């Protein structure tokens, strides 16, 4: 992805951003607590403790909706809940840097 090529050489601390995401409410039902759900997935066996630029693609979803998204897939999830997950991820990232 083009975004990653822009920031490959930049050392970023994503822990604060993940805390920011986890302070939000679920995009679907508004509940808390939430998981930081990666749009650009880490994958099975990926090192979730290692900081990654992929952390900036996270959205807040409660455990129920996080599990649902992975069960039915992003396309069906977006259609069912009338969401654009990448757009939401962008708005959250923009809001984080605006604070």
Predicted regions: what is each one?
Residues 1-18, 22-35, 87-99:
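A boundary/linker detector
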Residues 32-36, 68-71:
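Short, non-ligating residues that shape and space the ligands of small metal-coordination modules
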Residues 23, 56-59:
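Residues immediately within or flanking Cys/His clusters that coordinate Zn2+
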């Amino acid at each position: 992805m083009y975004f990653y090529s822009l920031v490959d050489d930049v050392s970023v601390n994503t822990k604060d951003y993940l805390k920011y995401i986890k302070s939000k409410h679920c995009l679907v039902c508004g509940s808390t607590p939430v998981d930081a759900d990666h749009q650009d997935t880490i994958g099975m066996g990926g090192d979730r403790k290692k900081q990654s630029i992929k952390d900036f693609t996270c959205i807040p979803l409660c455990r129920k909706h996080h599990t649902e998204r992975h069960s039915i897939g992003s396309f069906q999830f977006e259609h069912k809940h009338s969401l654009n997950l990448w757009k939401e991820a962008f708005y959250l990232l923009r809001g984080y840097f605006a604070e």
